[in-house]
């Protein structure tokens, strides 16, 4: 404990070291500058550190002091003054080097120059430029191939010993394909022109046909209208209706005047007149008729009951009492 107190007392007796402020670089103090270059502008940069915290007195002594705010000032000349200074400095350098100017090369340009100057490792210094459509095999021979301009398919030309032979084969085949492509393009253009002319001619002929058909239809319609309206209805013959009135509408019709004759006049007005007193044509009582002649007075029905014959009207009561359902008997 005593040692710690001694150390703390020693540390408190040490004087506080203040940070040294760097003076900004000023061109005003440089000798040999004109008055235009001495007119400077000041740039001030202020940076705040949000993570800087306040420490106690003991911690400030042990640790490096950390400021929350940094201020930096830079003096810069104006643009015209800067260009003038560069020209003056270049003139001074040329005069010092006996008229030989030194060019400043940037770092990027230096790298580019170095890359161009250094040879590529693993490749021969003498590189051969290969023509189009020619490539070298692994065993040293040269292969040539070309793409067909119409079908867009690769055509194999062959394998050759030298590069010149493969290039000549490619060139000859290319000339042939170029001529073929030109011929096909010319033929297609001619066909397109002919088709366009044919289409235009067919369209014009169709238009003419339509116009002719429309004109003929209009003429026929006009003639039919004139014929229908020019008809003279005065020349139309109307038949007389008297012939239809004189004829009898009902065939085989008989007159009913016989009912109102003088002979039967008193009978119609009699209160005790019967059907027998009327004379109906075609239904005489004494004469023959088309209806069948039946006499039901002597009819006896044998019902098979105990072998005896019953009264001719008693079977109706017997049927009503014995049979639950009616009999379907067809009448003559």
From Swiss-Prot:
It is found in: Nucleus. The keyword Transcription applies. InterPro entries: AP2/ERF_dom (IPR001471), AP2/ERF_dom_sf (IPR036955), AP2/ERF_ERF_subfamily (IPR050913), DNA-bd_dom_sf (IPR016177). One of its GO terms (biological process) is ethylene-activated signaling pathway. GO terms for molecular function: DNA binding; DNA-binding transcription factor activity. SUPFAM superfamilies: DNA-binding domain. Its main location: nucleus. Residues 130-187 bind DNA. Residues 15-24 have a biased composition (Basic residues). Residues 1-33 are annotated as: Disordered. One of its GO terms (cellular component) is nucleus. Keywords: Activator, DNA-binding, Ethylene signaling pathway, Nucleus, Transcription, Transcription regulation. It comes from the Eukaryota. Probably acts as a transcriptional activator. Binds to the GCC-box pathogenesis-related promoter element. May be involved in the regulation of gene expression by stress factors and by components of stress signal transduction pathways. Belongs to the AP2/ERF transcription factor family. ERF subfamily. This is Ethylene-responsive transcription factor ERF119. It comes from Arabidopsis thaliana.
């Amino acid at each position: 404990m005593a040692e710690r107190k001694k150390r703390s007392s020693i540390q408190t007796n040490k004087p506080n070291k203040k940070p040294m402020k760097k003076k900004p670089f000023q061109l005003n103090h440089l000798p040999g500058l004109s008055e235009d270059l001495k007119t400077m502008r000041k740039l001030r940069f202020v940076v705040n550190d949000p993570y800087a915290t306040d420490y106690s007195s003991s911690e400030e002594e042990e640790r490096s002091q950390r400021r929350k705010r940094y201020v930096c000032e830079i003096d810069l000349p104006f643009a015209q003054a800067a260009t003038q200074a560069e020209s003056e400095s270049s003139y001074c350098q040329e005069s010092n080097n006996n008229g030989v100017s030194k060019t400043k090369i940037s770092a990027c340009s230096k790298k580019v120059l170095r890359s161009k100057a250094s040879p590529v490792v693993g490749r021969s210094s003498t590189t051969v430029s290969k023509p189009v459509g020619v490539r070298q095999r692994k065993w040293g021979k040269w292969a040539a191939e070309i793409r067909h301009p119409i079908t867009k398919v690769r055509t194999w030309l062959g394998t050759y010993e030298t590069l010149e032979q493969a290039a000549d084969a490619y060139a000859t085949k290319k000339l042939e394909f170029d001529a073929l492509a030109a011929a096909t393009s010319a033929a297609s253009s001619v066909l397109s022109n002919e088709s366009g002319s044919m289409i235009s001619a067919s369209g014009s002929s169709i238009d003419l046909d339509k116009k002719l058909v429309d004109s003929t239809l209009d003429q026929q319609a006009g003639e039919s209208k004139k014929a229908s309206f020019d008809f003279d209805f005065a020349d139309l013959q109307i038949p007389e209706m008297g012939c239809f009135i004189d004829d009898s509408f009902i065939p085989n019709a008989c007159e009913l005047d016989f009912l109102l004759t003088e002979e039967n006049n008193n009978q119609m007005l009699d209160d005790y007149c019967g059907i027998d007193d009327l004379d109906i044509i075609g239904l005489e009582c004494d004469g023959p008729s088309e209806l069948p002649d039946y006499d039901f007075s002597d009819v006896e029905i044998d019902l098979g009951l105990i072998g005896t014959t019953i009264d001719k009207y008693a079977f109706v009561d017997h049927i009503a009492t014995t049979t639950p359902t009616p009999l379907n008997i067809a009448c003559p």
